[in-house]
Structures are given as structure tokens and as C-alpha cells.
Amino acid sequence: MLRQIAIADAYGAGFEFSSQEKIDNHNDLTRYMAHDLTGSCGKYTDDTQMNIALAELIASGESWTPETVANHFVDTFNRDPRGGYSKRFRAVLDECSSGQDLLKSIKPESTRNGAAMRSPVIAYLGNEEAIRSHCELQASVTHNTPIATQSSQAVALAAYFGLSQTGTVAEIPSFLKSHGVNIWNYEWQGESTVQAYDACSAALTCLLNCRQLSSLIIECVALGGDTDTVAAIAVGIAACYTEYEKDIPEKLLDSLDEVTYGVAFLDDLNNQLHTSLTSNQAQD
């Protein structure tokens, strides 16, 4: 999951709120594009980094509390500061040395997509009740609003539905409905804003329409808007389904511009998640 999220994120970042002309001319998965504002190219953003933070929390076996969640957000950022965060949240993180600092500094009233984008990895908790409660807890740290919480739960549960081999992609809406988080527009069209409802609706629409990771990324980016987040969410979920062809071009994998926290690191962390999942399932 994590390497796919990173590639989708880094690829989508090159088209984030770009012109339709740029998307039409270059959205073909042949190479990463530079971000229009920062010039960054082939580097993943906050979408991947925050999945890493929660993945490391899961793998550590620590108890989830607002402070432990916040600690992992701060520690992961401080060891590897990078772009993609909103200006306001980035300014807060720049001043934090601990989770306690973050909790004191932030007003968690956002309805944006930050809680959703970091939720695919929560599927590795391997238990529907635990997934729902942990989504609510982690969302409360930065996005303590009903829509943000529901978006987090929808993303993690959709990923779990595939990871547990319980159902198919086409059955995701029914599965989410059974958990009371089926409020999304599955026929989304046009740009996705940074709002949780938009990003979740856009990602799920594209997810239901495709069965190949390559076509999924292209379709997410083709919508325009917050392309890196929509692609990262959709691909994070899709990676959990055997019916999805894992056909991301090797060229994108090889040219991901990450050294310390690149593909090898992500694969090792993903292996730790699988070990944690097996342990959680054995306990159930």
C-alpha cells in the first residue's frame, strides 16, 4: 500500500490545482511533473508522510491517545520536513517539538481532507470496531468535525474491506452504508477542493470506475483540483483489492525522488503493518 500511495501522491502533486491544459498535455504516467508553485518534482507530500506517521504508530504497538497520535505527526515531520501541508498547519508544525505542543497550538475545527488522506493505513488495525474508533480519535487531533471523522472512517473501512478480502470494489458503497458512512457522491465530476466531502467523493468515484492502478491515477488527476490527495486516497484503497491490477509504471517507482524515506523504507514499514495485521487477527 505505502509505495503505491507515495507514487500516486508524488505524481498527483505535479498537477495539484494546475491548469486543464497541463493536465491534458501531460497526464499520461510517463514522468513526474514539477509542482506549479514549489517546483518540487517526484517527491511525495503530506498525504504520504501522515500515512507513515500512523503506520509507525500501528507498528509500534503503542496505545492510541491524542498525544501519541500527535507525537507521531510531529516526529515524522520534524525528521523529514516537506511540502504539501496547508500554510497554517505547516506553521504550527514548524514550532512544535512534541505532540503536546501540537495539541496546545491547534484548533481542530477543520472540515478539510487531512483526516481522510492519512486513513488508508488504519485498515491494518484489522477490526471494524477498532478502525472506526481509531479514525475518530486521530481525526479529533486536527479535524474534530463530523464530516472529517466520517471521511476518515469511510477511507479506512473501504481499504479494510479489500484487505480482509471480505468483498469487491463494487460492493464498497453497500459496505460503507452498513457502517453509516455512506454520504458520498459516487458520480463526482469536476475538480475536487480540499474539503473532506469533495476529496472522498472524488476518490471513491474514480475507485469504482477503474480496475487498474494506472488508469485510476490518471482518472483522479484528470478531475483537477487537489489531485495528490484524491489520487493518494483512491490508490491507498485500491492497493488492498486483488481485483485491482498493480500496474504502476516501473519508471515512476525508479524515479521517485526519495532517499532516506523512499521505497525501501516504505516497503519495510508495510511489512511491519502486515505483521501487525496478522497479530491483530490472531487476537480476534
Report the location of each language-model feature.
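Structured, active/binding-site neighborhoods that engage oxygen-rich ligands
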Residues: 1-284
